[in-house]
Amino acid sequence: MTPKKKIFQNFQANDNEILSPTKKGIKLNVSKLNILNFENTIITKEKTNYEYKASLNKEIDEVLNNNNIINTHNNKKNNLNLYDYNNIKNSTHEFYIDLNEQNKQTIKYNDNKFTPINKKEKYNLDETSSSSISSSLTNISSSLTNISSSLTNISSSLSNSLDEKKKKKKIKKNNSTIINILNNNNNNSNIHHNNKHNIYNKYNISKKPQNKEIHTLPSNHQIKKKSNNTYNTCQQKMKKNISKKNTHSIKNNQNDKNKEKNKEKDKNIKKDRDKDIQTKRTSHQSQDQNNHFERRILRSYTRNNDNVKNNLKNNINNNNTLKRSSQSVRIDSDLSSAHQNKRIKYDEKNIIHRNNNNNNNNNNKTTSNNHNKNNKINNNNPSENYKKQTDTKHTNNTQNNKYNKTKTTNTFKHPSKDHTDVNTKTFKSRYINTYTMEEVQKSIKSNTIKLVQENSCEYQDGIIYESIQINDEEYSIGEDVLIFYTPNNNTYNAKSDDKKNQNNNNIKENIYLLKKGKISSFYKSTNSKVIEVEICFYYDESDEQRIRELEKKQTSRRCKEDFNIYLDDDTKYYNLLGNIHFTILDANYIYKKIYVYNEIETFEEDTHARKGKNKFLCTHFIKDKEDRLCFIPNEDHWDNLVLGSSDLYYYFANEKKLNKNKSLKLIIEKLKINDKINDTQANQKKNNKKEYMNKAQTTTNVKANTHTKTLNDHNKSKTTKNKESSSTSFLQDVKKKSDPHNNDFQSSLKEDQENYYINLLKNIKDPTDKAIRMMQLDVVPKYLPCREKEIKEVHGFLESGIKQSGSNQILYISGMPGTGKTATVYSVIQLLQIKSRKKLLPSFNVFEINGMNVVHPNAAYQVFYKQLFNKKPPNALNSFKIIDRLFNKSQKDNRDVSILIIDEIDYLITKTQKVLFTLFDWPTKINSKLILIAISNTMDLPDRLIPRCRSRLAFGRLVFSPYKGDEIEKIIKERLENCKEIIDHTAIQLCARKVANVSGDIRKALQICRKAFENKRGHKIVPRDITEATNQLFDSPLTNAINYLPWAFKIFLTCLIIELRIINEFVIPYKKVVNRYKILIETSGKYIGMCSDNELFKIMLDKLVKMGILLIRPYIPLENISKNKSKEALLGFNESSKKGNNQKITRAQVSPDIDKESGDMGIELNVETQLIITALMKDPDCSKKLNFY
């Protein structure tokens, strides 16, 4: 027979990535680390198909009212609809395997001795321990049933006797039995309390047949198993107790009425007995059903508040006789004493303190003589009294009694000595499966660990591994293991005083537990040889105290919303399902692999894994959350969460805290992945670097890495350092030249460009991937093709300015977007840096301000200040004063020349234009040593400036014209030199022509080619593919709307595009568009007569403006009309006269030359030009006109 396949529970369906909470930046795979999100977990609610028997309810109520022996006040404290720890343990099934496993036997650590215990019976999932509240209620109910049964025996004995003296003696005997029963009941609750920490020992205890001769009350396990047959067991035991106990006085409230009631009770009990036997054969109730049954008992008798409250007042004085002994401290006493002293924790250190307090309280009380004697016996001889209780327990609880016996005897025999020995035993009894340091060291002594280099990555000062091998067995991320763990590392231990912690520090260091957990990652630091494992622990029996603290906090809350206040940060942010917390341990302490399930069905179906060996069930919910507990607020970032590619860190927040806490944060230290490309480039840089110390006092040198910069990488203003970054080939060529003044920079740059492309594509094998990489915008070579003229002009301007120490040097560069303005400037700066490094030019510094990144134009002073002095800038005014003082020095100094590049200078224009005037005025100072380069995307910026600003731009202007079709074709061919075979020559021509007809933006051409390569991967690109890629990039609802416009509207837009190309301005005169439209209509031969209809022009213009395609602007062609007149005169404003002139003031008039030229109305495009051209190219007539012009 072949074993069945392993069935594992799929804890999470989504294969996403997260970051580790301990390393703060380590990306992990949630498909492997699947404990954080159990989407498929199905929580079955407790069944509520239980019926409460009316007869039992009535009998309990009558006994409560008649005898008044229950302190209902303490019971009401526990009568809360809250989850408790013992109930939680019902849903968490624990199995463990000890170190020494031979012949299916487990060794239990008890009093420093190993005792083998046979473990042959299979574990029953339905048999678990009950909650503390329900167990106390069952003890009360059992005592009540014993009392009722004893009363029936009393009545029967009274009716059969003939002699009155004999009656009195028997009554005394029975009364004494009642008192002894109550004392035994209290002692039994004490046994339950002392054994509470060892509640999991029942899995390792071998069951033996019960000894019927021993007379005790039923244990907690028997009450749960025989909850339907309690009267039968109690009545048999009471008959034996009556014959053994001494006589005692009885109260006078036993009347004839009670005799009749007892007879009726006997009849009802017999009927219930028969029913219970039948139900016991047919039904096997689970642990949750018993707990629910006991809760219903509690609710039933608390509903009879009238009788209970009345009897409570009368029973307060009588309850002193039934005070708990020194051994029977219950949970209620802890809750009641919390208001007077510190809350007593359920820890091993407080057992002595708790017993001593009870002794003192019992000695100070004064009651009747009989009760005083009992208290003295309990105080003086606690161990003997406790031995009597343990003797009456069943054999299957003997081992628990041994633990309790060691606790009590040690605490009273050595009250004055140090309690270290006591604490060691109590501590070991606190946790199950504890091991000493010697045992653990023996087991891990022979371990051999091997690292698996596959899928490893660098992190800070070490390396993270996905898997390791321990004794030739591989352990990887996401696997469940058993690991040795010291309790002193547990952050969830209860807080206590420093003195108490000092007593047990040495003890906890020598104790190890076997805990379940899921592996998150492995880490090895370069400074140490230890391999660390990050592990997330599951819920375990050692976390009992933590859960109890949560229960107490929950009971003290007023409403559910305030419950989060009482929780710590670990519970708030790591409210995970079925686990406790993350921690980092030594990987050598991993014991073995296990399998963990969160559903009973899958747990039972997996028959291949053995129970108690490597098979575990974990269904614990810390805060009873049914929904998903791991939240990522922004789902758009899931796609970017690949190992090493993202710098985002996510906190795990609760659903309530999600709106308040944004869980997205940036990580300062990013992961360093083993990238071969980056390594090769870094090695080249290290071989070529040579540092030169500059004389600069306030600035640093320039770092020129323009081959890795993109046209968009210069958005952030920053100071660059002057370091060597060119390749070795270029340096060798420079060294070979004998005369440095006759260097051919163009030829050297071309060779450097070829080497740059070769190094970039070295590790890429697929031709399509090579083409896609070359079409990306970040690939910017040092040599820019088709810009030789502009490079020479910028080079000559900057070289002369540096040699002249930057006196009165300002250059204004304008042009359409994507024409290479910024890239040209930085390529020239790189050439000048090479000369400066060869001592052909003086050293210089480069600073940059991007107008788009400045919040306000005045903030440009702060950006410039930070780069100049490398300090945090003050406010804008103080920054301006300090910089202005620097550039307005009257004496010369040893400062290097500074080059200031202002990109997107249009965004620095204000109403008064003070910022631009200041920036343009600084280079004109004698000792400023400042060179200014202003870059703008608008052609008419100088015309919009005030005269004092415009006059300072008269030193130099440079216009970058858009790329033409042949130039775009040349650039694409040079980039695709290494993969020519995957694209057709006609496809390149079509792409270049389309882009040149629109805007001449080279970035658009690169995007179209890359889109075509991505769509037709592995196939040769043809013109049809270029057309499809263009439509995908530029198609929009607007282009579809233009396609459905009438033919006259399309011709009008075509005329507008043609005039835009001719004039090269943003605002086109309306009359010129109309004249162009008349010419096209007349030459086309269509719709003759439409050209003279002025109403048609108004309709077309109004329609296009309403669609949002056009805007109407005022148009005043100042330069074309009169070059000799000033701006004020052309606008019709009379110039202000000087003082002393008696000229008359006239009205402001518009010059008549304006109307003669082109009128006062202009048209401006309100959408991207490419969208309109894409729509017009689909019309044959419009496409012919656009291609012609």
UniProtKB/Swiss-Prot annotation:
It holds the Pfam family AAA. It is found in: Nucleus; Chromosome, Telomere; Nucleus, Nucleolus. Coiled coil: none annotated. The keyword Nucleotide-binding applies. GO terms for cellular component: chromosome, telomeric region; cytoplasm; nuclear origin of replication recognition complex; nucleolus; nucleus. Residues 254-279, 385-394, 710-724, 733-742 have a biased composition (Basic and acidic residues). The modification Phosphothreonine is found at residue 2. Possible candidate for an effective malaria vaccine as determined by epitope response in sera. Residues 304-320, 353-381, 395-411 have a biased composition (Low complexity). The modification Phosphoserine is found at residue 20. Mg(2+) binds at residues 903-904. Residues 321-339, 695-709 have a biased composition (Polar residues). Keywords: ATP-binding, Chromosome, DNA replication, DNA-binding, Hydrolase, Magnesium, Merozoite, Metal-binding, Nucleotide-binding, Nucleus, Phosphoprotein, Repeat, Telomere. Component of the origin recognition complex (ORC) that binds origins of replication and thus may regulate the initiation of DNA replication. DNA-binding may not be ATP-dependent. In a SIR2A/Sir2-dependent manner, binds to and silences telomers and subtelomeric repeat regions (TAREs). In a SIR2A/Sir2-dependent manner, binds to promoters of var genes localized next to TAREs resulting in their silencing. Component of the origin recognition complex (ORC). Interacts (via PIP-box) with PCNA1; the interaction occurs during DNA replication in trophozoites. Belongs to the ORC1 family. The N-terminal domain binds telomeric DNA and is required for the silencing of telomers and var genes. This is Origin recognition complex subunit 1. It comes from Plasmodium falciparum (isolate 3D7). The lineage of its organism: Eukaryota, Sar, Alveolata, Apicomplexa, Aconoidasida. The gene is ORC1.
